[in-house]
């Protein structure tokens, strides 16, 4: 029987997984410095969680969700995005209570699932890095979230990225805008795509996100939400923009930006990368915004919230082109070679001692000839080769060779007891 991975999935092999680990660790370190803590939620949830949060008319729910009935007759869905599960956990575990400091800031790094056409940077199983902040409706919470996204891309070495930003206002603004869109699109309904005709009666805002060719001719003249914003929404949006100006963060106010999920309210944003070697036009690598009603939607108290998500596959595609130096194989610190009776166990002890000091170290479990061990040390990219023979074992010594310049050092076993002492002797 020939077995293959399902279409739209990828094996992340060891030569690549280290690159993912480096990106994820960079994100973890940044988020922790901002006092965000990791949250882990199930990879599958009840179907209604996503259908209610993402919107019944969204592409995610209508076309892309993996859902099924389990053996207990429950309607289950694999998570297509990270926010809904985090909100569910926030409500179910009563994190809105007084025992938790607000804003409650979390991040996640997890696999998601959408039935999409596989292409470069987009798979049916994909990975997302995200942050969510619950409990503050202040404009600085929006600014902080945007800055976290900006600073993460900067730390990773992403080039030519641009912040696109818009606001959807509150529920009253959305309703007024909804009515204006219905009035605009209804006379040309028969000329719209099938999807847009269906969405016109349910959520015409989704039409603005359409990629269908027949819809494009009507989008440029469609009403703009900025013309329907109330004074409070305008004031809040202007505070965010003024803060970004003062902080030196450039942005583009994008009237066409609506985001693909129905739960957004207030500010929304995307970071787009302009790289013609990757895409014909600028493409989104990070997106998010404010969602002040989703906690209530899941029977929690009124709770403002804001967050963003990054598709890792797309991010890795960008970094492989723009910052390949980040992924250069650093090899390992030490490879222990040995020859002679009794040296095998000592090689194991030396490797364990080096690891306890924080170094990466490997020895030859196959105990091949010394020449073969040296070849392996070179193949794994060792910075130093430790040689241990019967004579060295008897004298309590070992030889260390620095491969970058061939310099050799004679060390006592006791030199391995202290990291600073060891480094002082081999980094001369």
Swiss-Prot record:
Its main location: cytoplasm. Keywords: Aminoacyl-tRNA synthetase, ATP-binding, Cytoplasm, Ligase, Nucleotide-binding, Protein biosynthesis. The keyword 4Fe-4S does not apply. GO terms for biological process: histidyl-tRNA aminoacylation. It catalyses: tRNA(His) + L-histidine + ATP = L-histidyl-tRNA(His) + AMP + diphosphate + H(+). GO terms for molecular function: ATP binding; catalytic activity, acting on a protein; histidine-tRNA ligase activity; transferase activity. One of its GO terms (cellular component) is cytoplasm. Its EC number is 6.1.1.21. InterPro entries: aa-tRNA-synth_II, aa-tRNA-synth_II/BPL/LPL, Anticodon-bd, Anticodon-bd_dom_sf, His-tRNA-ligase, HisRS-like_core, HisRS/HisZ, HisRS_anticodon. It is an enzyme of class 6 (ligase). It is found in: Cytoplasm. The keyword Disulfide bond does not apply. Homodimer. Belongs to the class-II aminoacyl-tRNA synthetase family. This is Histidine--tRNA ligase. It comes from Lactobacillus delbrueckii subsp. bulgaricus (strain ATCC BAA-365 / Lb-18). The lineage of its organism: Bacteria, Bacillati, Bacillota, Bacilli, Lactobacillales.
């Amino acid at each position: 029987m020939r077995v293959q991975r399902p279409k739209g999935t990828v094996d992340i092999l060891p030569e690549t997984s280290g690159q993912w680990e480096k990106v994820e660790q960079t994100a973890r370190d940044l988020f922790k410095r901002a006092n965000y803590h990791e949250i882990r939620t199930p990879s599958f949830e009840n179907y209604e969680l996503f259908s209610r949060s993402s919107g019944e008319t969204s592409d995610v729910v209508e076309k892309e969700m993996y859902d099924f009935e389990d053996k207990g007759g429950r309607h289950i869905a694999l998570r297509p995005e990270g926010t809904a599960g985090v909100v569910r956990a926030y409500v179910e575990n009563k994190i809105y209570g007084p025992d938790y400091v607000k804003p409650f800031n979390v991040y996640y790094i997890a696999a998601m699932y959408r039935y999409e056409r596989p292409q470069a940077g987009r798979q049916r199983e994909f990975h997302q890095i995200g942050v969510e902040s619950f409990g503050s409706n202040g404009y600085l919470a929006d600014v902080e979230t945007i800055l976290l996204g900006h600073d993460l891309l900067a730390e990773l070495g992403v080039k030519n990225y641009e912040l696109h930003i818009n606001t959807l206002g509150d529920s009253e603004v959305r309703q007024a805008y909804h009515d204006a869109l219905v009035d605009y699109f209804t006379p040309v309904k028969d000329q719209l795509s099938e999807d847009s005709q269906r969405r016109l009666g349910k959520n015409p805002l989704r039409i603005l996100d359409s990629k269908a060719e027949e819809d494009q001719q009507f989008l440029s003249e469609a009403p703009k939400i900025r013309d329907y914003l109330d004074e409070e929404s305008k004031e809040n949006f202007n505070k965010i923009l003024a803060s970004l100006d003062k902080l030196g963060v450039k942005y583009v106010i994008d009237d066409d930006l609506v985001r693909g999920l129905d739960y957004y309210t207030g500010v929304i944003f995307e970071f787009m990368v302009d790289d013609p070697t990757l895409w014909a036009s600028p493409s989104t690598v990070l997106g998010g915004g404010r969602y002040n009603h989703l906690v209530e939607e899941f029977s929690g108290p009124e709770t403002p919230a804001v967050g963003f998500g990054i598709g890792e596959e797309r991010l890795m595609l960008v970094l492989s082109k723009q910052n390949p130096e980040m992924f250069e194989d650093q090899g390992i610190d030490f490879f222990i070679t040995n020859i002679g009776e009794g040296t095998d166990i000592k090689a194991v002890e030396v490797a364990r001692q080096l690891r306890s000091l924080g170094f990466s170290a490997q020895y030859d479990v196959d105990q091949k000839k010394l020449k073969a061990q040296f070849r392996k040390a070179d193949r794994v990219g060792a910075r130093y080769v430790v040689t241990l023979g019967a004579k060295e074992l008897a004298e309590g010594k070992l030889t260390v060779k620095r491969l970058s310049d061939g310099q050799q050092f004679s060390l006592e076993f006791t030199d391995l007891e202290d990291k600073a002492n060891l480094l002082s002797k081999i980094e001369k």
